[in-house]
Amino acid sequence: SCFNCKDFIKTADPDIILMNPPYNAKPIGIPDTYKVNWGKAKDGKEDPTKGLVFVHYLSDIVEEMNVEREVAGKARKTVKMAVLLPVAAAIGNKNIIQSEKIALLENNTLEAVFTLPNEIFYPGASASACCMVFTLGEPHIRADGTLHETFFGYFKEDGFKKKKYLGRVEQFDENGNSKWKAIEEEWLDVFRNHLSKDGLSATAKVTGEDEWLCEAYMKTDYTTLREDDFQQTLNNYLAYLLKEGKIYES
């Protein structure tokens, strides 16, 4: 567990961290200091922060490193982090998740959140995921009281298709060109330039009390909507209800 690796992390003195924490870690393995306000959830079966507590832990290590740097007369440093989390962590309408989000922005900046394709981990876990990008060690609220602007990407269609036994397979157009390559270039362009594009991206100044998903801020591109889109949404919702046992096939 990373909770036992603080000395290793401090010695490594990272500039970039890539992390994919467990979405449903058992609370028993999480340090008590992070569970003070969890109530009954601290004795539950799943991490009520949906993985945000792991980000909080690494953030605390970076802050500890910066305090030590200041004592030694050195400049503070920042660390870039990209972390995969379930979308539930970004929505954060439950008190425990919202408290984690608020705490995270005290010492760190939320640079970007990307909503990822459905079943991105196929044929593995079926969780709906997003990627959050933080600058650890730099408060989200500037010294003058203004907020950093966050980029939000609705990156659901990446040009891959699910294939049984093969996973998600890259697709090509009639000329043999990779569909993903063209999509990747567009995604990088809107992100690097903080562009707002209907149906794809948006920027917003958010706090820990807000939703951290593009769907809450982007404008819909109605010119691309088809009847099939509505049918697909209904089909997905029906599949979800069946999976959760809320309805049953007769």
Regions found by a protein language model. Name each.
Residues 1-11:
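S-adenosyl-L-methionine
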Residues 11, 15-250:
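A conserved structural/catalytic subdomain of Rossmann-like adenosyl-cofactor enzymes
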